[in-house]
Curated annotation (Swiss-Prot):
The lineage of its organism: Bacteria, Bacillati, Bacillota, Bacilli, Lactobacillales. Its EC number is 7.-.-.-. SUPFAM superfamilies: P-loop containing nucleoside triphosphate hydrolases (SSF52540). This is Energy-coupling factor transporter ATP-binding protein EcfA3. One of its GO terms (molecular function) is ATPase-coupled transmembrane transporter activity. Pfam families: ABC_tran. It is an enzyme of class 7 (translocase).
Amino acid sequence: MEINFRNVSFSYQLNTPFSTAALKDVSFDIPDGSFTSIVGHTGSGKSTVLQLIDGLLIPEKGHIQAGSFQMNSGSNAKHLKKFRKNVGFIFQFSENQLFEETVEKDLIFGPKNFGVEEKIAKEKARKVLKIVNLPESFLQKSPLDLSGGQRRRVAIASILISDPQLLLLDEPVIGLDPGSKDEIMNLFSRLNQQGKTIVMVSHEMDDVADYSDQIIVLNAGRISKVGSPEEIFSDESYLRKEKLRLPSAIDFAKQLKKVGFPINVSIKNKRELLREIKKQFEIEKDKK
């Protein structure tokens, strides 16, 4: 699903003495099937963008085109409800939304509310557990008996069961251990490769560099820069100005370069860093 913002502005508590401008004349494009990350400091407007895309908030000015749906200040609730069937929104600490006695009951809650027969909903639940790499035996477990990473995957499965075209991720791996983080991000990468459009808000620059096709940098409610990971993270003076951290692999490669190690710093992640270091050692070995 392609998404286009055109001159979008939004204020919280509009027309009150407490009105706060969250977005100011923002325009950008998110290509269909892309993995786009939105970064910036607290208060820059990142989460507001996600809520506008989902129709939880309505633009004060401008419009948003999401697939065949357009959202503007005149959009109504019925129109937005139809659109939201195409969108999956995974919030921070999404496992806190689990409330049923068993994993199966949690998973089928949404489909049943949309009129899906219970038998069909249960079959969907079995299939979606496989997508998030959990065994079918988990269906009868209580979410309270699962680890934090497993609960997060169940929460993600409860969104994926409706097969949304668009996934909105708000700090999706916050609070997880490194192993669980990798599993969750690899899951999103596979879903993206299968054609789902993904928009992620994150402070995890390693994940932003590793998985994104495009990065949108927000600053105080305005677009600061839009570019590929290579374009964003190669400009150190810009990163310092925006107070954005270099991904750890890129930072390590640049530190090696500074002390004379002949390494290509145009890398995205730790896997590429290790390959590049190994390559340079092999080159040095062949010279001897």
